[in-house]
Amino acid sequence: MSGSCAAPGPGSGSSPAACRFAHYFVLCGIDADSGLEPDELAGENFDQSPLRRTFKSKVLAHYPQNIEWNPFDQDAVNMLCMPKGLSFRTQTDNKDPQFHSFIITREDGSRTYGFVLTFYEEVTSKQICTAMQTLYQMHNAEHYSSVYASSSCSMDSLASSLDEGDTTSLLKLQRYNSYDISRDTLYVSKSICLITPLPFMQACKKFLIQLYKAVTSQQPPPLPLESYIHNILYEVPLPPPGRSLKFYGVYEPVICQRPGPSELPLSDYPLREAFELLGLENLVQVFTCVLLEMQILLYSQDYQRLMTVAEGITTLLFPFQWQHVYVPILPASLLHFLDAPVPYLMGLQSKEGTDRSKLELPQEANLCFVDIDNHFIELPEEFPQFPNKVDFIQELSEVLVQFGIPPEGSLHCSESTSKLKNMVLKDLVNDKKNGNVCTNNISMYELLKGNETIARLQALAKRTGVAVEKMDLSASLGEKDKDLKLHCEEAELRDYQLNVQLREVFANRFTQMFADYEAFVIQTAQDMESWLTNREQMQNFDKASFLSDQPEPYLPFLSRFIETQMFATFIDNKIMSQWEEKDPLLRVFDTRIDKIRLYNVRAPTLRTSIYQKCSTLKEAAQSIEQRLMKMDHTAIHPHLLDMKIGQGKYEQGFFPKLQSDVLATGPTSNNRWVSRSATAQRRKERLRQHSEHVGLDNDLREKYMQEARSLGKNLRQPKLSDLSPAVIAQTNCKFVEGLLKECRMKTKRMLVEKMGHEAVELGHGEANITGLEENTLIASLCDLLERIWSHGLQVKQGKSALWSHLIQFQDREEKQEHLAESPVALGPERRKSDSGVMLPTLRVSLIQDMRHIQNMSEIKTDVGRARAWIRLSLEKKLLSQHLKQLLSNQPLTKKLYKRYAFLRCEEEREQFLYHLLSLNAVDYFCFTSVFTTIMIPYRSVIIPIKKLSNAIITSNPWICVSGELGDTGVMQIPKNLLEMTFECQNLGKLTTVQIGHDNSGLLAKWLVDCVMVRNEITGHTYRFPCGRWLGKGIDDGSLERILIGELMTSASDEDLVKQCRTPPQQKSPTTARRLSITSLTGKNNKPNAGQIQEGIGEAVNNIVKHFHKPEKERGSLTVLLCGENGLVAALEQVFHHGFKSARIFHKNVFIWDFIEKVVAYFETTDQILDNEDDVLIQKSSCKTFCHYVNAINTAPRNIGKDGKFQILVCLGTRDRLLPQWIPLLAECPAITRMYEESALLRDRMTVNSLIRILQTIQDFTIVLEGSLIKGVDV
C-alpha cells in the first residue's frame, strides 16, 4: 500500500481501473425468462412450504462487462450475493432490507470485496405468480394429507402445536402459511452489489442504502441512478495512503479514509460489533485458535455478523496473515468444504431454530466452533493460552470501557434491543405526519440502526430497567435531524478510533513478543534463487534458541505458534526482503520494533514476562481523527450522462433497468482524475514492458515462492465459480495431495530433528530441538491424523474420527477372537535362552494397546483417547504397523469412508504409512512423559551367571526400581524366583535398580550378571548391568548394589538374549574399571595419564552442558555422575593410576582402603600441612572429610567398598567439597605408601589441574537421586 493505488494483481498498473474505488456494480435477482428453478445445490428440504424454499438466483446485470486483470467471476458473485438463493415473501412477511458483505479470495491469495444490499421487490410476472400458487397447491395437498394421517407434521409448519379440532386456528395457519394469487402480493429478493479492491465497508453500505432509498422514495432521485453508479465506478478514485476522500451518494456525501504507509493496514469492519457479539474473553480465545491455525467455524443467522467477526479477528493478526482457506460466508452449495482436511476459517449460516447438537460436522477434533448468536464457543482439547492472557484482557477491557462497551459483550441486551428496534419501526410506520410509506421508513432505519447513540440508548434502557413505552420517537428524531447527522459522524469517528486502539493493543503484544526475532532468523543463502530452490530443506528460524530465550509461561503457546504457516511466511518475507522490496506488513512491524529499541534498549538474553502496555493509543486515534475531520480529496459530483431520453423511467419500489451503454465504459480523458494519473500510467507501462524481458526469471521465482509458501497447504481456496463433479473431484485430489505432502514434511521434520538430538547425546553435534518442540511436533502429528481420518467420512460417529474407526475395528476383532479358541500373538514365539531366564515376549497387539488406553480413567474424551493411543503407538514404534492393520480391514474402511476419502486412495495411503514407518528410526517417550500419574505394570528378571555361582540362594533378595518420576520402594523377591511382575505409578524413564539380600543361609553369595526391567505398556526394556558378587567375604563385600540402567534397542528375542549376557568388558562401570586395573592379564587395557585426564574433562563438561539445557529438557544426572563415562568412573581412573595393587599386598586393595587410611591419619594427628594462612580452611576441610567418610561407613546399608567411594564422590560433588578434599588426599603421608611415584595424585600440576576442573561445576545445584545416598546422614 505504499503507492497511491491498490495493487490487486499482476498487470494492474496498466489499467486506470486499478486506481478506482469500485470495480463492478452488480444486480442479482430472479430471471423472469427462466422462471422458478429450485436451488438443488442449497440442499433444501422440499417438505418446506414454497415461501420457505430457496430458488436459483442469477446475475441480471453487471457493469462494466469485464476488467482485464480482474475478470468478473459471475458464479462466485451470484453465490455470495445470495448465498441461499432467491427467497419469496408476501405482504404479511417481514421485508426489511439486509446488508452483508463478502470476500472472494483467488487461488493466488489476492482478494476482492463485495458489499450487498438485499431488498424485496414486488413480482410483476404472472407466470411466476402462477407457478408459486401451483407449488402451494401441490404442497398443501401433500401436507394436509400427512397431517390427518399422523399426529406429526413437518418442522416448518406450526400445525403440530394446534389442536386438530380447532378449525379457526387451522384456518389461520393456512392463511399465514400459504399464497393466494387473487389475495396476496408476492415479493422476491433482489440484490445490488459493489465489488471493490479494498474493504471500504462503511462507505459502500451508505452508498447502497442511498440507492435503495432512491428506489423506494415517493419522489424520484435528483439524477437518474445511472449517474450515481457511473460516478462511483469511474469517477471516484481510491484515496491515496494516509488520505481521506469524500464522494457523493444520491442524497448525502460519503467519506472514507485510508491509513498511511507507516500505520496498521486498512480495516473498516467495526471491532465494536465483534467484541459485543462474542465478548472479550471468547474473542481472545478464538483469536488464539486462529493464530494456531486450527479449523474455525463461525455460526450465525446473519451473514454480516459472520463477516464482521471473521474480518475483525484476521485484522488483529498483524503482522501475520491467515494463509489457509478463508470463506467467511460459505454458500449452501459449498457445504462439502467443511470436509476439508486443512486449517480453515469459514462462516456457516444457521437456520432459525436449529439446535447446535443437530449440526453434524465432519470433524471436530481440532475445531473451534463459534456460535455468534448465542455468545458461545467450543474450543479444541489441549488448547494453550495466549501469553499474559489475564493482563492482555485487562488492557483490552480498559479500552472497551473507555468507549462504553461492556467487556463481557452485549448478548444479554439483544432481546430488549430487538424489542426497542421493533417499537421504533412500528412508530415510524404508524406516524402519519412523516408522509413516508412503510418501506421508506424501514430504509431510514437502515441508515440509523448502526448509530452508536441509538445503540447506547437501547443498552442504557436495558441496564437501568426502564420500560420503553410506545412514544412518538420519529417526531423527536425528525426535529433533531441536524443534530442526529452530527451524532452519526461522531459515532463513526468513535468506531474508527476504537478500531485502531484495539488493533494497537494486539499489535503491541506481538511487537513485545517478537522484538528480537531478527536475531534468530537464519540467512544462509547467498542469492534468492538458491534460497528458493532449497527452501524445503532449509531451516530459516532458530526455534530452539528462540524458545530457550522466552519466559517459561509463554512456551506452550509459542512452541506451537512458530510451527504455523503464517509464522513461516512471515520469516520467508523477512529473508526475501534481502533481495526485493519488503512486504508492507513486515515493513511496518520492523519500524515499530526499531522504535521500541530507541526507548527501551533490550538484549535477546534479557527476556522477561513483565507485561508492557501499549503506549501509542492516543497517537493512533489522533491520526484517524485528523483525516476524518478534514477531507484531503473530493471526488467529482455525480452528473447527467449522455443518455437516451425516456429509458429507465422511475417507478417507486422497483429498481429500474439501467442503460448498459452508458455504464459499460468510463469517461473520456478530460476527466481530471484520469489525466492526473496518465503520466503515472505511462511510467507503469514502461515498467511492465521491462518486466516482460525478465519474465522467465520472475515466473521461476513465483513458482518457487508459491511452492515454498504453500508447504502443508496445497489447496489455498475453494473455487466458487465451477461446481461440476470434475472440479469437485479435482479439489479432493488436491486435498489428498496436500495431506500426503504435509505428512511427509512433518515426519521428515520430526525425524531429522530427533536424530539431531540423539546425535548430541552421543557427542556428535549441537542440540537443535527441545522436549517442548518435540511435544509440539507430536501434537501436530496427532492433529494431522485426525484430519486424515475425518476426510470423506460417510457418517460422523464421534468427535474423533480415528477413535471411532478404532472402536469399530476393535468390536469386529473381539467378535472374531471369541469365535477362535485362543488369541494368536503377532510377535515371534518365545524361546528359552542359554541361561534359562529371560523376559517373555511382549505381544504386539493393536487391540491390547487400545485396552491400555481404555483403562486409563484420567482420559475422559474420545479425542484424548485417540491422541494417547497415537503417542503410545509412536513410543512403541508401532504407529505405522497398527494403522496398516487398521486399514487392512477393507470392508470396514469402505463402510466408513466415501470413495474420494484419503484413506481409500490406495497409492497415497501406502506412501502415508511409509512416511510414518520412518519414525521408527528414533526413540520417543511421548506417552511415558505425558501420562505421569497412571498405574503401569512392570516385569523384572534377574539374570545370574550360573557357571560361576548358584542360581538359587538361601538368603532373602530384594529389589528397588527407580525412575525419573519416582521409585517402587523395596520389594521382596520370592525365594527361588528370578522373575516378578509389579504395578506402580509411572516411574518415567528408569534410571537405577538397587538389588541386595540379607546374607542369611548357607548359599548367600550371588553373582548377578544383570537385571532386566520392562514397562509392560510401552514395551521399553531397560538393562541394568552388574557382573559383581553380592555377599560377605567376596569381591568388595557388598550385600547391595546400585545398578545404572540403559535402554535396550528394539530387538528380536535371540538378540535380546545375547544383549542380556554381560560381555567380559561390558559389565557394570565399576566392574569394567576394576578388571582393567587389577587383572594380571589386562595390562593393555590400562588407560594412560593423558586418557585419564581427558576422561575427567569430558565427564565434567557433560555435567556443565546438562545444566545449560532448559530444566525440562535435561536427562538423567545420575548417568552423568555414576554411568560408564560419568564423573565417578573418571575419578576412579585417577585414583587407580599408580595404585599399588594386590601383587604387593597379597590381597585385593580398594580405593576405599586408601580413603580410610587418610581419615585415620587426620583423626590421630594435629599436624597441619604447609601453608599456615590456610590453617582454618584446611582444618574445616579435614573435619568435613572425616565426617562424610564416617557417615558412609556407619550408614545402615550393606554397601561394598566401591559403592562407598561412589557415594563419597556424589556427596562431595553435591556439596561442592571435592576441590577441597583432593589436595588433602594428595598431601597425606599415606599416599607414599599406597601409590607409586608416577601416580597422577602425586603430581602437583596434575592435582592442581584436577582441582580447577572440578571447580567449574561448583556453580550448579546438584540434586542426587535418593537411591544413591539413602541411609547416609550428613
From Swiss-Prot:
Coiled coil: none annotated. The modification Phosphoserine is found at residues 49, 178, 822, 1068, 1076, 1079. Residues 39-244 form the uDENN domain. It is found in: Membrane. GO terms for biological process: positive regulation of triglyceride transport. It is a single-pass membrane protein. This is DENN domain-containing protein 5B. Belongs to the RAB6IP1 family. Keywords: Acetylation, Guanine-nucleotide releasing factor, Membrane, Phosphoprotein, Repeat, Transmembrane, Transmembrane helix. PROSITE patterns: DENN (PS50211), PLAT (PS50095), RUN (PS50826). The chain crosses the membrane at residues 916-936. Pfam families: dDENN, DENN, PLAT, RUN, uDENN. It comes from Homo sapiens (Human). Residues 772-932, 1118-1267 form the RUN domain. SUPFAM superfamilies: Lipase/lipooxygenase domain (PLAT/LH2 domain), RUN domain-like. Residues 936-1044 form the PLAT domain.
